[in-house]
């Protein structure tokens, strides 16, 4: 257990706010305890970041990159320990948390390349002078992290922000404070100067204090649509502050004319049930053609999903699904399923809470075709809604019938169908014959509508971590060859 859980100006401090704790959702054990950061501690963290800003941003880029690269090396050295920490706090299997740490490490080189390509210096010739486009850091930025990828996703904001020369105050999810603490200790080991990256742990009040601090220059958020909308309202009337929002989705996956049924079923499983359905890109709605071909695919899907192994993150025989983040989240999925059943949905595979006190659930599939007004909700767990369709265009229209717009996909053999689908579907990530949970860090990541505010992260994070500055320059002031009308010298 740790009591010094806030990192402010290079010092580990006890939180002055109310105590909170983190649970291992697979073993129902308290694994971390600490006090939340008070409003005054949040303010101190912002002040520390402000005090460190000029020193950090004035460093040569290569000097900043040397520390960031050292952090990447240390992630490799601490891979097993960090993977276990993530597994204990999230319930995800070790095979998956190891891939998360690897993604954190891989983010470094990608972020460096993106910074160079998207925010480098450009010189354009012009008569009698030189024109430049350069980029400058915003200053002090807040980063809010989620619980589903407590290392990788905040890392995707923090790394490009630091490369650009910003200083950061990081507020992780209150459900994964132990992972955040481990990350910050690795940054310290890498030699990051004090005040450049500060950590404020806590629940809602800590987050409100940070988001509402008048001295931050921006906020980068990954999390629920509800919280993102609250932040958007809080930032209203403050155009001088940049707000980058990455939120959830009610993501459609359409199946049409597939010849390899098992290949399609595998893509569906990876789209809907990986990470126990706790990825923002997970498929929530599956559209399958009516008729014998669709019936065969649904039958095979139910067979395969019914055999998915659910178990402890550290089991010798690794499961595909671990626990959800908490018992509360697990019970929320049971309640969501019951609501859909009450509206007319028919469970083909019932999601069940497997063990009291834990986040373990079995995966579920529910046919919601008969529900006339399907709720536009993101059910953040392993519950897949099945919709049978007759007309491809109608399926696309229904897929678009959501306030969200994060990910979407088509499973089908016809390229003309794919081209049509790509043109019509509204989402920021659109895949063909691949799981819609699959995304490349070398591409932008984000959505439209209630899924984000057009501030795509991943490769495009460099865009919101620095602002462009246009300059026209000459080595000295000089009279022009010809004066403007009405001027006399």
UniProtKB/Swiss-Prot annotation:
Keywords: Arginine metabolism, NAD, Oxidoreductase
Transmembrane segments: none
Enzyme Commission number(s): 1.2.1.71
One Pfam family hit: Aldedh
Pathway(s) annotated for this protein in UniProt: Amino-acid degradation; L-arginine degradation via AST pathway; L-glutamate and succinate from L-arginine: step 4/5
Active site annotation, chain numbering: 246, 280
GO biological process: arginine catabolic process to glutamate; arginine catabolic process to succinate
The keyword NAD appears for this protein: yes
Gene Ontology molecular-function annotations: succinylglutamate-semialdehyde dehydrogenase activity
Binding annotation for NAD(+): 223-228
Reactions catalysed according to its record: N-succinyl-L-glutamate 5-semialdehyde + NAD(+) + H2O = N-succinyl-L-glutamate + NADH + 2 H(+)
Domain of life: Bacteria
NCBIfam families: arg_catab_astD (TIGR03240), PRK09457.1 (NF006992)
Protein family according to the UniProt entry: Belongs to the aldehyde dehydrogenase family. AstD subfamily.
HAMAP family recorded: Aldedh_AstD
PANTHER family per the UniProt record, alphabetical: SUCCINATE-SEMIALDEHYDE DEHYDROGENASE, MITOCHONDRIAL
Function: Catalyzes the NAD-dependent reduction of succinylglutamate semialdehyde into succinylglutamate.
Protein's UniProt name: N-succinylglutamate 5-semialdehyde dehydrogenase
Protein encoded by which gene: astD
């Amino acid at each position: 257990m740790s009591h010094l859980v806030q990192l402010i100006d290079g010092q580990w401090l006890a939180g002055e706010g109310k105590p909170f704790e983190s649970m291992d959702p697979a073993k129902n054990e308290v694994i971390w305890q600490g006090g939340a950061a008070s409003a005054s501690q949040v303010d101190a963290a912002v002040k520390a970041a402000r005090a460190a800003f000029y020193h950090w941003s004035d460093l040569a880029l290569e000097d900043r990159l040397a520390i960031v690269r050292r952090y990447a090396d240390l992630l490799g050295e601490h891979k097993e320990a960090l993977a276990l920490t993530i597994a204990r706090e999230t319930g995800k299997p070790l095979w998956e948390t190891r891939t998360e740490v690897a993604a954190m490490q891989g983010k470094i080189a990608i972020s460096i390349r993106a910074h160079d390509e998207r925010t480098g210096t450009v010189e354009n010739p012009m008569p009698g002078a030189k024109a430049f486009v350069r980029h400058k850091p915003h200053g002090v930025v807040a980063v809010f992290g989620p619980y589903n990828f407590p290392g990788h996703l905040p890392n995707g904001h923090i790394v490009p922000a630091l490369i650009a020369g910003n200083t950061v105050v990081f507020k992780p999810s209150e459900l994964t404070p132990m992972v955040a603490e481990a990350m910050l200790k690795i940054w310290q080991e890498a030699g990051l100067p004090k005040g450049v990256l500060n950590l404020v742990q806590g629940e809602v009040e800590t987050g409100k204090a940070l988001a509402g601090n008048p001295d931050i220059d921006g906020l980068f958020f990954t999390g629920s649509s509800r919280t993102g909308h609250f932040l958007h309202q809080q930032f209203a009337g403050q155009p001088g502050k940049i707000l980058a929002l990455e939120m959830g989705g009610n993501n459609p996956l359409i199946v049409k004319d597939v010849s390899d049924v098992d290949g399609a079923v595998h893509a569906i499983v990876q789209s809907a049930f990986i990470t126990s359905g706790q990825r923002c890109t997970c498929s929530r709605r599956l559209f399958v053609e009516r008729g014998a071909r669709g019936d065969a695919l649904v039958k095979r899907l139910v067979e395969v999903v019914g055999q998915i192994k659910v178990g402890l993150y550290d089991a010798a025989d690794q499961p595909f699904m671990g626990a959800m983040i908490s018992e509360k989240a697990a019970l929320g999925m049971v309640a969501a399923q019951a609501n859909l059943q009450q509206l007319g949905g028919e469970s083909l595979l019932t999601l069940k809470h497997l063990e009291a006190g834990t986040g373990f659930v079995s995966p579920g599939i529910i046919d919601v075709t008969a529900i006339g007004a399907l709720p536009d909700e993101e059910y953040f767990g392993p519950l897949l809604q099945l919709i049978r369709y007759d007309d491809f265009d109608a399926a696309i229209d229904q897929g678009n019938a959501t306030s969200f717009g994060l990910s979407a996909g088509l499973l089908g053999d016809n390229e003309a169908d794919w081209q049509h689908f790509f043109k019509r579907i509204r989402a920021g990530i659109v895949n063909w014959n691949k799981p819609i949970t699959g995304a490349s860090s070398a591409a932008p990541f984000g959505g439209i509508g209630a899924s984000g505010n057009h501030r795509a992260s991943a490769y495009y994070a460099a865009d919101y971590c620095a602002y462009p500055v246009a300059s026209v320059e000459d080595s000295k002031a000089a009279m022009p060859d010809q004066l403007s009308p009405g001027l006399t010298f």
